[in-house]
Amino acid sequence: MKKILVGSNAFFKDFKGFKSKDKDYLVFIDNPEDFKIRKEICLRGIDMFYYKRLSPIEMINYTLETNDPLLIGKFLVPEVAEELKLSVTDILALEPMLSKLDEQHQYQVIIFNHIKNNNSFILTEEQLDEAYQFYLSTRKDKEK
């Protein structure tokens, strides 16, 4: 069972001073017995997201049907894209949902736009730093 690190840790774990309240992992299950499409288990700062392995189109369509913008982030992680054999074109259908992200997840809009412009899930250090600086700005305001 392969665990893929997702969420802010997937992008910013190597940045000096980065701290996250939790770690999110994504696991794909070929034939789940105790859930239909997804299941989430949170325990002591570790959030496990289990998904039935679907085709890229089915995964995108499921995300669109749920209308939950927080599901977008997993598609931006290069390891997830590789595991699902996603193309940049595949994720473009999710673009209208970006406007529904809350402020603390708006860094994903920056990442999405860079992926789109690069036509690649691999970002430059400068692009990741831009997203990280935005990420930090949304957290600092909440601490005051």
Model segments located where?
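Short, conserved charged micro-motifs
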Residues: 31-38
